[in-house]
């Protein structure tokens, strides 16, 4: 078994690399190292079990080449951090939605099951606790740049579910909530590692 992890040199992705290796799965990592770090993979690097491709998920040629070599895909690559989202909203939207579109098309082409990571931000301003995936969502004004991230991730979910609906591409969506832990950096505006 071999898995592709986009964003596999990032904070969450590097932990997934370790877990899959522990379960006997070989791993291909695709990461542009814009927020991921090579150091996150140094201690697990083994040419027979882990391969790192330094490139972007926005390149269909690269993504297709990676996807056809694996049995399943974990799509974690994304714009990261409040600072980037506020300072570069165009880059945020284009990289999130564009990258996910490229990954989903490649997975559909080669019939590879895919897990798409989303965010708790897609719940928006909902007042109901606990959150429910079936609840209606209330987002902030489009003039508030912070909502571009939540809306882009929601569009990722719509794209993934559309691929399931149209072609029965096996898709799982995981909404991550405020992840923290070793190897996380405060460099991109994350609060906990800053303290």
Predicted regions and their residues:
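Short, intrinsically disordered, charge-balanced linker/junction segments flanking boundaries
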Residues: 192-195
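Substrate-binding strand-loop-helix patch
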Residues: 95, 182-189
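N-terminal Rossmann-like NAD(P)+-binding domain of SDR-like oxidoreductases, especially those catalyzing
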Residues: 1-179
């Amino acid at each position: 078994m071999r898995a592709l992890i986009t964003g596999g040199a990032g904070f969450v992705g590097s932990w997934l690399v370790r877990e899959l290796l522990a379960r006997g799965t070989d791993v291909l990592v695709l990461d542009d190292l814009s927020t991921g770090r090579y150091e996150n993979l140094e201690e697990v690097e083994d040419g027979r079990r882990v391969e790192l491709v330094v490139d972007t998920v926005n390149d269909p040629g690269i993504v297709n080449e990676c996807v056809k070599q694996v049995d399943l895909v974990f799509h974690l690559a994304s714009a990261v951090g409040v600072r980037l989202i506020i300072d570069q909203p165009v880059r945020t939207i284009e990289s999130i939605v564009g990258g996910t579109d490229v990954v989903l098309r490649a997975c559909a082409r080669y019939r590879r099951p895919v897990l798409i990571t989303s965010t708790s931000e897609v719940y928006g301003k909902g007042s109901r606790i606990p959150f429910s995936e079936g609840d209606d969502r209330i987002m902030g004004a489009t003039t508030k740049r912070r909502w571009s991230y939540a809306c882009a991730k929601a569009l990722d979910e719509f794209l993934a579910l559309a691929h399931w609906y149209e072609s029965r591409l096996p898709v799982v969506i995981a909404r991550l909530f405020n992840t923290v832990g070793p190897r996380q950096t405060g460099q991109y505006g994350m609060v906990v590692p800053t303290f």
